[in-house]
């Protein structure tokens, strides 16, 4: 019996069918890692929180359900809350931070890890600054109160939707007294 063309191709690469299946399975599992396994480096998170809230701010970790929230204060006065999340870009996760002030308005957003080959403009300050001061009552929609980025439509839409959802969660948890 002659080997199939696929088996001959694998043999030419020095792979058996079992090796090829193992390789494909491993790559599939790697791509499906949960968002929690794709967190930013601690130094990057610390730099982002310092940039947003200033040096010397105290950061306490709070757990609400399965979510991690950072409560930020200085000299006992609440500065706001921050949360790190992942959202799917075109193909890969985008790790971002949403930071609020004590009145639940967006203080800033930060792109902590951008993994896509294109669309990285969502990390640039001119695009991020349009979120500042927005509340959960704002539409936060690309094309309305948030500008689109030519060539980064998927990323700008994904980040905008994710920021809107995260801001709504933080605002609700704060109103419910769950962020103490």
Model-inferred region functions:
Residues 1-24, 31-34, 38:
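A cross-taxon signal for low-complexity, glycine/charged-rich
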Residues 33-157, 161-180:
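Flexible, solvent-exposed loop/hinge segments and secondary-structure transition points
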């Amino acid at each position: 019996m002659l080997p199939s063309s696929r088996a001959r191709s694998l043999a030419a690469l020095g792979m058996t069918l079992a090796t090829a299946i193992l390789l494909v399975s491993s790559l599939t599992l790697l791509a499906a890692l949960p968002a929690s396994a794709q967190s930013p480096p601690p130094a990057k998170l610390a730099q982002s929180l310092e940039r947003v809230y200033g040096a010397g701010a105290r950061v306490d970790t709070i757990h609400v359900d399965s979510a991690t929230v950072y409560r930020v204060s200085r000299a006992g006065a609440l500065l706001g809350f921050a949360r790190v999340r992942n959202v799917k870009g075109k193909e890969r996760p985008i790790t971002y931070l949403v930071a609020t002030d004590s009145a639940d308005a967006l203080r800033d957003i930060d792109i902590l890890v951008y993994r896509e080959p294109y669309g990285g403009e969502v990390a640039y300050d001119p695009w991020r600054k349009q979120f500042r001061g927005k509340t959960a009552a704002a539409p936060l929609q690309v094309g309305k109160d948030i500008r689109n980025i030519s060539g980064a439509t998927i990323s700008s839409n994904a980040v905008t939707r994710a920021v809107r959802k995260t801001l709504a969660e933080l605002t609700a948890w704060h109103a419910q007294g769950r962020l103490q």
